[in-house]
């Protein structure tokens, strides 16, 4: 049923909840997991200089130590957990608008399922904040499994 499962990650608790589900499915269906870290170029434009933003747009993440370290840590955590279950994993880092990068990656790599986390927000708060998950759902033809993450009070 599933041969390739994409799990976008930023290393957050929300993303980690999705990783658990992605790995469970991969183990069950003997699927390969793709761990994708997306650098949101729109949000870093304001905090970085022009040269840094150009590096991001060109995908030259190796030249940006702290960013590369964060990305490797997030995708590496998925790879480590996958290794414990004998699940094959592909790690990838890309820059752009997250929902677009996720959708494009899924189509370019023949992904059968995208597994994403979402904060358990509702009502006006969700509408005002928007979400990468919601935008991804609206912009891709690949099935998306949304894993709700509710923070404990």
Each PLM stretch: what is its role?
Residues 3-53:
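Small/aliphatic-rich secondary-structure junction motif
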Residues 105-153:
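Gly/Ser-rich helix-loop-strand patches that form or flank binding pockets
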Residues 31-32, 87, 111, 142:
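Short glycine/serine/threonine/alanine-rich loop segments
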Residues 42-43, 99-101, 123:
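Generic structural signal for helix capping and beta-alpha/helix-loop junctions
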Residues 80-114, 149-153:
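Structural beta-alpha unit
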């Amino acid at each position: 049923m599933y041969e390739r499962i994409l799990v976008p990650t930023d290393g957050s608790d929300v993303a980690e909840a999705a990783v658990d589900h992605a790995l469970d499915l991969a183990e069950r269906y003997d699927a390969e997991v793709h761990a994708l870290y997306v650098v949101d170029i729109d949000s870093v434009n304001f905090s970085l200089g022009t040269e840094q933003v150009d590096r991001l747009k060109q995908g030259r993440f190796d030249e940006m130590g702290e960013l590369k370290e964060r990305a490797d840590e997030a995708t590496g955590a998925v790879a480590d957990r996958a290794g414990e279950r004998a699940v094959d994993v592909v790690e990838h880092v890309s820059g752009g608008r997250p929902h677009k990068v996720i959708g494009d990656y899924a189509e370019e790599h023949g992904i059968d399922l995208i597994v994403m986390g979402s904060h358990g927000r509702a009502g006006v708060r969700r509408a005002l904040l928007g979400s990468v998950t919601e935008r991804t759902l609206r912009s891709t033809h690949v099935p998306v499994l949304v894993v709700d993450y509710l923070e404990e009070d």
